[in-house]
Amino acid sequence: MTRADARENRARILEVAREALAEDGTTSMNQIAQRAGVGPGTLYRNFPTREALALAVYRLEIDQLTGSVPGLLAALPPREALRRWTTDLVSAMRRKHGLGDALSPAGHQSATDQSYGPVITAITRLLDAGKHDGTIRPDADPRDFLQLTGALWRAATGPEDRSQPMLTLILDGLSTHPGKAR
C-alpha cells in the first residue's frame, strides 16, 4: 500500500467514524471498518482503541472549525462571520457530546484541553475583527464568549431548538449597536 492509499484510508475511516459516532455513539470498531471499506487491521493500525478514534475525529473537527475563520472573515462582515462560526461550533460541540459513549471521562477532558487554545484563538480573531470594524464592544472577551456559547449546544435540538435566538441575544450583548446586522 502506498502512502497516498494509507492517507486515503485514514481520511475515509475518520469521515465514516464521524458520521457513525454522531448517529450512534455505541457503533463498534468493526462496523466502522466495514462502512469505511477497510479491514479491521487497517483500522486498528491507525486507531488502536475506540477512544483514540473518537479523539481523532474530534481533533479533525476542531481543526476544520478553527481553520474556517480566515475564509469566513474574508467573505462576511465580522459579526456575521462570528454568527456562522458559532453555529458551526455549536454543531461540533453537540457531536462531541454525542461521542460520550466512545470517550472516557479522561478522554472528554483530553478533548477539551486540546481544543481550548485553538478555539479561543479563533474566537479572538473573530472578536478582534468586529472590534476593529466597530460592531463588537471593545471589552468583549473570548473566554466569556466561549462560556456563554456552552448553553447553546446544550439547548434542545429539533423543533424546540432555541440556539439561534439565544445566539442573537449573545451577539446583541457583544454589539456596539444591539439589534443591528442580524
Language-model segment annotations:
Residues 37-47:
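Short hydrophobic/aromatic patch on the recognition helix
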Residues 47, 54-61:
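Alpha-helical DNA-contacting segments of helix-turn-helix folds
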Residues 51-53, 98:
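A secondary-structure capping/hinge motif
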